[in-house]
Amino acid sequence: MSAADVDLRVFADYDRDVREETDVVVVGSGPCGAVVAKELTDAGQRVVLIEEGPPFTPAEYELDGPFSMARTMREGGLRTTLGTVIPTMQAICLGGGSLVNSAICVRAPDFVLDRWCSDFELPHTRRADLDPHYDAVGAFLGISPTPENVLGPRNLLFKKGCDALGIPSEPISRNVRGCRGSGECFTGCRSRAKQSMDVSYVPAALRGGAKVLTSVRVEQVVVEGRRATGIVGHVVTPFTGKPSFEVRVRARRVVLAAGCMATPVLLQKSGDLANGSGQVGANLQFHPGVAMVGVFPELVNPQFGATQGYQSLHFLRNGFKLETLWAPPAVLAVRMPGAGLALKQRLSLAPHSAVWDGIASCNRSLGSVRARRRGLDPKLTWNFHPDDVPILAHALHTLARIFFAAGAKVVIPGVHGIPEELHSLAEAEILRTRAFRAGEFVTASNHAFCTTRMHGDPRRGVVDELGRCHDLDGLYIADTGIFPQCPSVNPMWTGMALAHRTARHIAAGG
């Protein structure tokens, strides 16, 4: 941020309690909240945008993956679920997850939107309804396919393998301008090419007159009668969360965009608000991800090239999406089998390796988000449905086929109970023929949804398709929690499109 952004407050700026009165208060500066803030300031509304985390500048980014996670992620990046254990990371910084994600932008496929409309009574959430909002967000962020000159070998080998097998694939569209292919998305883009919210929508909202309060934890939604009228929280010390000055914002409308885990906790902590349907915190869904390492005879140097630059959407109706992957070596090493000398030998192969992953759509695998007695970090429970487990095996088997078609000499599947290395297609058949249990896969997911789902029937959902809470006037939700089911693809662009629609509705007096 520049010095001209005088309405951006950081921790050092607070020396007393904060009192604000505004048209709209938006809780959460991630992709959805930032869109709402910018669109409403464009419409002439007074907006206060609140973020619990601090802002980061490129000089503050840390290439050390675990250290970066400890600073930018909730619970130090070590959040997991009960039940079927799955690690999941949510950001705590200005810009939210957009600061540390791979900038992947994919529109939800038609079959997903059609299912949402028919199964959840959402008649105006079809392709024709959402495309204008996708288009508006895409134009603002410069969303476009990854150009070949920044793909690097890791991404091009994926294309080579898919082409050899006749599997359709494509460059991933991303919200970047002038990407250099430095592969540092996970720890923050030092070149500022990635159009994360802190360099795109938030500055635009500031230029439009928004006030942005960072290092403020919202703890309660204030309600008068049947109407939400503001929020209460505290200034918190970055990285420790120690509270100090009280913050009160009175507003004509409250928009919760804190993410599908923090938003339901905030509602629960506010007296179980907006829960006439019983759906607040219910229906937690993930995109469980599995990754495979392939080792090639030639140098790959996987640290070079767009972090995630190529994908195949061919298997979406089979329940999974395939894509390339990169992250700091210390993060990826967690997925490698072995210990001691064996692990060191495998890690020494990194210059010849590529990592690709599959994300699974698991609509039968459900969980919940519940507030703990103290603090705002949630109690997460999630269970893998047995009928969803074969999707992971199918994804890994397909990745093995692509790796060998691209020329890999060995793949490392990261699955318990089978060989640590597979050296041929014949050996990889075990991924197709064996019956697996969920706990045998090394999975993770940062895509989470559905905990405040939208539904046309107030008895079965928290909000309507415009993000309006059924139970309270003046309260809106704009994050991936309103998805009725998982979107089958990376969720950011769909969340932003829905948030754009919600903002336009509010601006029109809704």
Label every PLM stretch briefly.
Residues 102-106, 480-493:
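Glycine-rich phosphate/pyrophosphate-binding beta-alpha loops
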Residues 1-24, 42, 500, 508-510:
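Extreme N-terminal leader/targeting segments of oxidoreductases
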Residues 123-220, 228, 410-442:
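Conserved redox-cofactor binding core of oxidoreductases
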Residues 39-42, 46, 53-58, 62-63, ...:
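Glycine-rich loop(s) and the adjacent beta-strand/alpha-helix scaffold that form part
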